[in-house]
Swiss-Prot record:
UniProt source species: Paraburkholderia xenovorans (strain LB400)
InterPro entries the record matches: Ribosomal_bS20, Ribosomal_bS20_sf
Keywords of the record: Ribonucleoprotein, Ribosomal protein, RNA-binding, rRNA-binding
Family: Belongs to the bacterial ribosomal protein bS20 family.
Keyword Magnesium (UniProt): no
Region (Disordered): 1-24
Any one GO MF annotation of this record: structural constituent of ribosome
Annotated NCBIfam families: S20
Protein name as annotated: Small ribosomal subunit protein bS20
Function: Binds directly to 16S ribosomal RNA.
């Protein structure tokens, strides 16, 4: 257990940061799930609209280094590709 004042303070700060970061990670996952849900429904317009809002959220969380920037870019790229591919099977 933390015995010095500075160790107690660091423990408090770590708990606070952990709580904040957990909330942001949850927001990241929720943003991705919202786009996935729209893609699964097959609504390209709605999926694109939600993707724009989610992209902003994903970028903000990556800028704060809650998730790595490459992970954020990978998710955005895969979501964009999935949205782009929604109309492709119907055209064939």
């Amino acid at each position: 257990m933390a015995n010095s004042a500075q160790a107690r303070k660091r423990a408090r700060q770590a708990a606070k940061a952990n709580s904040h970061n957990s909330a942001l990670r949850s927001k990241f996952r929720t943003a991705i799930k919202a786009v996935r849900k729209a893609i699964d429904a097959g609504d390209k317009a709605k999926a694109a609209e939600i993707f724009l809002a989610s992209s902003k959220t994903i970028d903000i969380i990556a800028d704060k280094k809650i998730v790595h920037k490459n992970k954020a870019a990978r998710h955005k790229s895969r979501l964009a590709a999935a949205i782009k591919g929604l109309q492709a099977p119907a055209a064939q």
